Amino acid sequence: MIFDTLNRLGQYRGICAGLDKLIDFTLAHDLNALPAGRNEIDGDNAWMNANVAPLVPETDLYERHLEHLDLQIPLDAGEIITVRPVEELEWDFEGETGFTHGPAGTALHMVPGTFAVFFPGDAHNCGISEAGQTSCRKLVGKAKL
C-alpha cells in the first residue's frame, strides 16, 4: 500500500507497468475535468473511473483484488479508508474482487491532494465519512498487474 500526496505521485514510477500508466494519465490530465464514468487508458489493462461515491458513518465491508491494483484519489471531500493485511480476514470472491466483513483497521484520512494505492495484498474498506459528509467525488484507477 502507498499513501502520499499527489505532488509526489511521480516518484512511484517503476514499481510496475500498470501503475506507471495510471501515474502518467493522472499527471497529464486535469483531474477535476474528467467525465463521469470509465476513462480509458489501456483497455482492460488500465482505466480511471470518475464517480461520486456515497459515504457512511461506518462500515466493516472490506474488498481486495486478485490481479489489479487500485489508485484512489479524492477530489472534493474527505474520506476515511481503513486497511488490513488480507491474511487477517476470510474472503468470498466474485471473480476478480473479494469481499468480507472485518474489524476496523488502520485509518487513512484521505483528503483532496492525497492518493492511495492498494495492491492485491491490501484489504481496503472504502466510503467512510469524514466529518459527516455524505458523498465524495473521487477517482479510482485500476491497473492489471
Q: What residues fall within each predicted segment?
A:
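Surface/interface-facing alpha-helical segments and adjacent flexible terminal/loop regions used
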Residues: M1-D44
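A short glycine-rich, His/Asp/Glu-containing loop-to-beta-strand
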Residues: P35-P57, Y62-E63, E67-L75
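Short acidic (Asp/Glu) patches
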Residues: N51-H65, F93-G105, D122-A123
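Short histidine-centered beta-strand/loop micro-motifs
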Residues: E58-H65, Q72, T82-R84, L108, ...
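Glycine- and acidic-residue-biased ligand/ion/polar-headgroup-sensing regions
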Residues: E67-L69, I73-I81, P85-E88, E94-H101
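A short hydrophobic beta-strand segment most commonly corresponding to one strand
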Residues: L71, F115-V117, Q133-L145
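Conserved metal-binding segment of the jelly-roll/cupin
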Residues: H109-S129
